[in-house]
Amino acid sequence: MTAVVNIAAYKFVSIANPADLREPMLEQAGQRQLKGTVLLAPEGINLFLAGAADAIEGFLRWLRADARFADLQAKYSESARMPFRKLLVKVKREIIRMDHPAIRPEAGRAPAVDAATLRRWLAQGRDDQGRELVMLDTRNAFEVEVGTFRGALDWRIERFTQFPQAVRDNQAALAGKTVVSFCTGGIRCEKAAIYMAEAGIEHVYQLEGGILKYFEETDGAGFDGACFVFDERVALDAALAPQA
């Protein structure tokens, strides 16, 4: 059986009229028999799609022909079955809701740490400057329960809009440490890292590409359990395979 290719991708980029993209997205993804969800907002695009390999690549070629999405990076995995039941393209106020409009990743990101560097930091327990390393899980509590980085902070938030208050409540404990925010695919931890930096936390990084990119580029060292995903696969192990 030919494997189903799954992609997750996002980009923070100004979209003046996101509603104008909805029908073209539905048409291009639909004619390729892709399923999943695409979120469009004035701040950018966030998508999770699955289908045949050539269909996925064809859709990405079409999408990247738009200059706003030319450098869109996708994270890949495979599954034996289609993990989505239908195709949805939704227009939202934010592609990941935080309710802090001043946080605009397109205007400037927090520093990012790549998977290989993080793996080394985890092994040594410190960053390259010798600062204590703190892994901060920015996901919802039910996601964290499926799996997270060993020893990671879990503030037990129920939705991402609670993250800013959690930072205010816990900021003092992060002083002088290197904080790496992480999430499933990178989108939440990107906003989270910007918020923390603007709140005055000095040494803040985001995990480039999130947990999924860490699994893709390393052996998953330091991660306990599996990564929850919002589709019928439920969770992926470090080999990006659905957890049995």
UniProtKB/Swiss-Prot annotation:
It is an enzyme of class 1 (oxidoreductase). Keywords: Oxidoreductase, tRNA processing. The keyword Oxidoreductase applies. One of its GO terms (biological process) is tRNA modification. Its EC number is 1.14.-.-. It comes from the Bacteria. The keyword tRNA processing applies. GO terms for molecular function: oxidoreductase activity, acting on paired donors, with incorporation or reduction of molecular oxygen. Belongs to the TrhO family. PANTHER family: RHODANESE-LIKE DOMAIN-CONTAINING PROTEIN 7-RELATED, THIOSULFATE SULFURTRANSFERASE/RHODANESE-LIKE DOMAIN-CONTAINING PROTEIN 2. This is tRNA uridine(34) hydroxylase. The gene is trhO.
